[in-house]
C-alpha cells in the first residue's frame, strides 16, 4: 500500500500534470482494498490474495522496479527484456542460456499464454543469443504443440526424413554467412521428433489426482483456466524444463487479451482477476514445496 495515496485521497495531485484536453485529470484515489501484514516477514498483502498471503514468506517481493513506458507494447517489452524499443534477449532466454536445461526432450523455455499478450513473440525472443534459447509458446493446453506429429509417416520414416533434412541444412549452412537460424532449425526438428513421445505425457493433466486438481482450483470455473496453467507449470518444471512463464489472459477478445489492463471499473476488474489467479498461484506454491 502507498501511504501517500491515503494522504491525498480525494484531492488533486500535488504536482503539475500534463494538459490533457480529451481526458481532464481526476482526483487521487486510495486503494479500495485493505492490506495487512502476513508471515514472519510482515509483508503487506491485499485482501484480494488471501491464498497467496499464506505463502508470503516464500516470496521475493521487489518494490523498487520502475517502467518508463505507459504503452502496452513498450511496457511489456521492458518488463521482459529490460529494453522498451530495441530487441534484447528475454529474461527466460538469459536463464536458459546461463543455466541450461535438464530435459533434452522438451523445450527449455516454455511460455503458456491462452492469447498472446501485447508485443507477442519478442517477449520471449532470444535476440542476439542463439535462436535455440527462445521460448516455445503454448496457447492451447489440449493441443500444446501444433503439427508435432506426422500421421502419414511412422517413426523410422520420420527419422530418415529428419536425417536428410539435417544433411541438407548443414550443406546450406556451410554456404551461408549466418548460421544461427539454421542451427536452431536443425535443433528444433530434432527436438520436435523427441517431443512426440515426451510432450503428450507432460501436458496431460488428467492423471493428476482430484485432490491436486482441487488444490489448483481446476474444479471451479472461476479458477479453472489459470489453475490448469499453474498445474502444467509444475509438471514441466518437475520434468526438467528450466523456465516456465505464465500469462493470465484467458479471453480471446481484443480487450480481454490484456485483462489486467483495466481502463475503467477498476474495483470489479481487479476483484475478478485476483479471484481467478489467487488460488492457482497458491496451489502451485504449495505443490512445489
Predicted regions and their residues:
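Ligand-binding pockets and gating/stacking loops
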Residues: 1-289
